[in-house]
Amino acid sequence: GMKNEILIQKRQRYWYDRCLEASGAKLVDFGSDEETTREDLINSITVNTAAVHFYMVEQEPDSKALSLEETIEIAHDNGIPVLVDAAGQIYPLDIFGKYVRMGADFQCIAAKYMGASQSTGLALGTEEMIRKISKQSFVGYEGRRIRGIGRPHKVDRQEMVGVVAAVRHWMTINHEERLASIEERSGRIIDILGGVEGVEVSMIDNIMGHQPFGVQLQVDEKITGVSLQDIVDKLKAGDPPIWTRVRENENFIAIHIFGLKEGQEEIVGSRIAELLR
C-alpha cells in the first residue's frame, strides 16, 4: 500500500508536528530524549517510510540531535525525501531558503514573520515536491478535480500578493536599522521593570530568525508573591488583554517585540510592573 510513516527525532517533537498527520500519515519517533545517532535513523527506515521531518531552529542549536546534513545524506541514500519546518528562519538573509539548497526536498517559511498575513507562507523545494503540493491545494482540488486535502485551506489572491510584497520588502530593508529599533524597544521594557523588587529582566541575546532580542522575565515568588503563571493569567484577563506564556521546562517569560506596534512595549512593561508592585 501507500507509504504512510514520517520519521521525526524524538528530541524534535514539538507543538505543531501533529499537522503532519492531517493527511493520514503516522509520525514515528527515532532516537531518544537524550540524543539521536545516525544508526537511530538508519534502523528506523522501513518499507512504510514516506519522509523524514526535521525541525530547524538555528538560534537554538542542539548538539545532541542528528544534524540536517546527516539526515539528508541517510534519507537520500534510502530514496526518502526530507521535509524541513523552517517557519522562522528568515534572518540572516543567507538562511532564507538555505535548507533546500543543502539538499532538503522541501522547506516551509512563515510569511507572517515578514509582515504578510497570518495565514500565509512559502513552500520551497524540488520541482517534484512543489508539483505534489500544488495538487493538494484548493486550486488543484477545483482546477484539476483531484480529491486532495487542501479544500479547507484556501489562500486568497490578495494574500498571495501580500506575500510577494512582504518578501520583496524583507529582502531590501535595512536590517541593521530594524534590529537596532527592536533592541531599543526591548530596552524600554527592561527600563520599566528593572527597579521592581524580586524581578530579574535581561535582554535576549539573539538576532537570528523571526524574533530578535526581546526580554527574559524571571520573578522571585517569595518576594513578589506572584508566580509567572499568575502574571500570564492576569495579563490575559486585563484590558487590553496581553497574551504571554511560560513554555514547558522554562522558568521565565519571553517578551518579544514582534507583533507589537510602536509604543505598545511600554504598555506591556507597565502592566507587568503594576502586577508586581
What is the predicted function of each stretch?
Residues 1-168, 190, 194:
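Conserved PLP-enzyme active-site core in the AAT-like
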Residues 146-215:
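Structural motif of enzymes handling amino- and sulfur-group chemistry
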Residues 190-274:
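Conserved C-terminal alpha-helix-loop-beta "cap" of PLP-dependent enzymes
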